């Protein structure tokens, strides 16, 4: 299987993915091997069902939301490039990246892009704001039936009251960023990938 992974990924593809995502050559080849092992249809793409076979996602209360983040609107398959773009949001920021070229595109693992990614997990209807109902749905996914609907409603109301600065009873991206300004998002939204 290891040889299959390395023969199907060309060096120029690896270089393009490195440039776009910041992953190292060895990380890309290792993740490609993982990608091909998940690709049960052996067609070079992953389906939602392929992702649902990953135990860590299957038990994660936000697993479905995370899985959906891998897929473009209306798509039911993701190729390796799209898979890597999404994973790049979770790549830790290295010290040498903090002083990167300011004129280049913002890295996918920047604080801003990590916040946009997290915001989209809550913004279920993609209207660029988190409503009380959306917050309730995500809270319900996270806590299950361990908290009453009344308690969840109280948590959602208090969260929106504290975050909502413009009085529209919803949380905009700017308000979301403000609430999380003291949170180490770079660390909390990072997964260590082996080199």
Swiss-Prot record:
It holds the Pfam family EF-hand_7. It comes from the Eukaryota. It is found in: Nucleus; Cytoplasm; Cytoplasm, Cytoskeleton; Endomembrane system. Phosphorylated. Calcium-binding or N-myristoylation are necessary for the Na(+)/H(+) exchange activities. One of its GO terms (molecular function) is microtubule binding. It is a lipid-anchor. Its main location: nucleus. Ca(2+) 1 binds at residues 123, 125, 127, 129, 134. Keywords: Calcium, Cell membrane, Cytoplasm, Cytoskeleton, Endoplasmic reticulum, Lipoprotein, Membrane, Metal-binding, Myristate, Nucleus, Phosphoprotein, Protein kinase inhibitor, Protein transport, Repeat, Transport. SMART domains: EFh. Residues 26-61, 66-101, 110-145, 151-186 form the EF-hand domain. A lipid is attached at residue 2 (N-myristoyl glycine). One of its GO terms (biological process) is protein stabilization. One of its GO terms (cellular component) is endoplasmic reticulum-Golgi intermediate compartment. The keyword Protein biosynthesis does not apply. The keyword Phosphoprotein applies. Ca(2+) 2 binds at residues 164, 166, 168, 175. Calcium-binding protein involved in different processes such as regulation of vesicular trafficking, plasma membrane Na(+)/H(+) exchanger and gene transcription. Involved in the constitutive exocytic membrane traffic. Mediates the association between microtubules and membrane-bound organelles of the endoplasmic reticulum and Golgi apparatus and is also required for the targeting and fusion of transcytotic vesicles (TCV) with the plasma membrane. Functions as an integral cofactor in cell pH regulation by controlling plasma membrane-type Na(+)/H(+) exchange activity. Belongs to the calcineurin regulatory subunit family. CHP subfamily. Monomer. This is Calcineurin B homologous protein 1.
């Amino acid at each position: 299987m290891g040889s299959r992974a390395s023969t199907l990924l060309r060096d120029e593809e690896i270089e393009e993915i490195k440039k776009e995502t910041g992953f190292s050559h060895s990380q890309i080849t290792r993740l490609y091997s993982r990608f091909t092992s998940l690709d049960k249809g052996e067609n070079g793409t992953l389906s939602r069902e392929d992702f649902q076979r990953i135990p860590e996602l299957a038990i994660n209360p936000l697993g479905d939301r995370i899985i959906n983040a891998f897929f473009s609107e209306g798509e039911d398959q993701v190729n390796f490039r799209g898979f890597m773009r999404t994973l790049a949001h979770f790549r830790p920021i290295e010290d040498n990246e903090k002083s990167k070229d300011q004129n280049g595109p913002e890295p996918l693992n920047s604080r801003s892009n990590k916040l946009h990614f997290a915001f989209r997990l809550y913004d279920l209807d993609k209207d660029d704001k988190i409503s009380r109902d959306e917050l309730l749905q995500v809270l319900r996914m996270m806590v299950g039936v361990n908290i009453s609907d009344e308690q969840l409603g109280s948590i959602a109301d208090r969260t929106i009251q504290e975050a909502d600065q413009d009085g529209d009873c919803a949380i905009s991206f700017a308000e979301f960023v403000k609430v999380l300004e003291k949170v180490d998002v770079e660390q909390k939204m990072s997964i260590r990938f082996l080199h």
